[in-house]
C-alpha cells in the first residue's frame, strides 16, 4: 500500500495571474467519512492508501503529495445577474490533474481547505452539511447519467466553522474534467487581457475540444454541451438553484450543488433556493438562463472570434441563438426516452408537454409519474386525482407506441432504464446530513449506496422512493457556504 499520486500541474503552469499558489491550511484532527473506491481506481489511486492515516492527511489538506502544485483559481462572474469582477476559489485549492482510465485529465480539488487570496474575508472552510450534500448529489447525478463533477472523498477536520451557527468542519475532494467556468473567461475579458484570454482559450480547447481550431469553435462546443446538460436536468426535475456564470462549466458538467433540489410535486415555476427570491433560476427558467450565461461567454470571447467587432458579434450571436434548436432536440430525446419511444415523430413534443401539463395540474410527483409508466396504467393513473384525465392522455400514448410495434417487455425495459426509481429526495438528503452532524454517518452511507443504482428495483429500500410526508418536506434549500 502506497500513496504515490502522479499529479500533473497543467493549470498551475499557466502565468501567475491565472491563480494564486498556496498550500492548504492544515486541520487539527482529520477523520475519514468516505472514499469513493471506484472513482479512486479509475484515477489510478489505491483506495486503501487514501483511507490510511497518510491518505486522510492528504485529503484534509495536512499533507501535499509530491508532484502537486496547489493553487486557487481566479475567476469572475455574474451572480443573479449582477457583475462581480473578482471571485475565485475562496475555499478551494486545486492539487493538480490526474489521468483518468478514459485517458482524459481530471482536476482534483480540495474544498474547505482554508483561506486563499480570493476568500473575500471568509474563513475558507466548509461545514459538514454542504460536504455531505455535495457528495450525495454529485454521485447521484453521475449514476443518473448526468455530466457532473464527482466526489472522491469526504473527511472531517475536528474543527468547527461559524456560519449562522457553529458547525462541524469538513473537507470535500472534488474531481472534475476541469474547473474552467464562464466566469474564468469573464475575469480576463473584463481586464482587457487579450494575451491571457488567448492562453485560456488554447488551454480550454486542448482540454475539452481538441478538434476545435478557433475560439468560435470552442464557444459552439460549450453551447452544445450545455444544451445537452440542461435537457438532462429538465428530464429529472432537477433545479440547480444558483446558475451564476461562475457556476457554468466549459466542460458541460454540473458544478456546485449548494441550494440544488429535485422537484417532488411537479410545477414548472418551482424554486427551492432561499436566495432566489425572484425565481430567476426556477425550473422552467433554466434553459433561458443558460442562454444568458452563454451570451456572457460569447461576449468575453469576442476579441478572439474576429478582429472586426461587428463581424464577431454577428457570428457569436448566431452561435448563441443556435442553443434553442440544440436544446429542443436534446429535450425531445430525453422525454421520448422517458415515454419509451425509440423513434421520432412531430407530435412527440405535444405528447410530452401534455403529460407535464396534467402532472402540474394534479401536483403529481415528477419522478413517480414517469416511473409509474413502467408499472402499468393502473398504477400510473392512481397518482392523479382525476384518473380519467390521465386515461385520455394514455390512449394517445399507447397509440404512439403502437406505431413502433413495441412489445410489453421491451417497453418496460425502455421505461425503467430512462426513468429512475430513486433520486436524492430533499428530505432524505437532509436526514442524512442531520444524522452526520450528530456523528452518525450510517444514513449517509445507506443513501449513497441506494443512489448508486437509481434505475434498479430495490425492494429493501422502497421507502427511499416515497415523497416526503408533510412534516418531512424540505421547501427551501440553502447555499451552506
Curated annotation (Swiss-Prot):
Keyword Cytoplasm belongs to the record: no
Keyword field: ATP-binding, Magnesium, Manganese, Metal-binding, Nucleotide-binding, Nucleotidyltransferase, Transferase
Organism: Dinoroseobacter shibae (strain DSM 16493 / NCIMB 14021 / DFL 12)
Residues the record marks as active site: 246 (proton acceptor)
Protein name: Protein nucleotidyltransferase YdiU
Keyword set includes Acetylation: no
Pfam families: SelO
Binding-site residues for ATP, renumbered to this chain: 88, 90-91, 111, 123-124, 174, 181, 256
Swiss-Prot/TrEMBL cofactor(s): Mg(2+); Mn(2+)
Disulfide bond residue pairs: none
GO molecular function: AMPylase activity; ATP binding; magnesium ion binding
HAMAP family: YdiU_SelO (MF_00692)
NCBIfam families tied to this protein: PRK00029.1
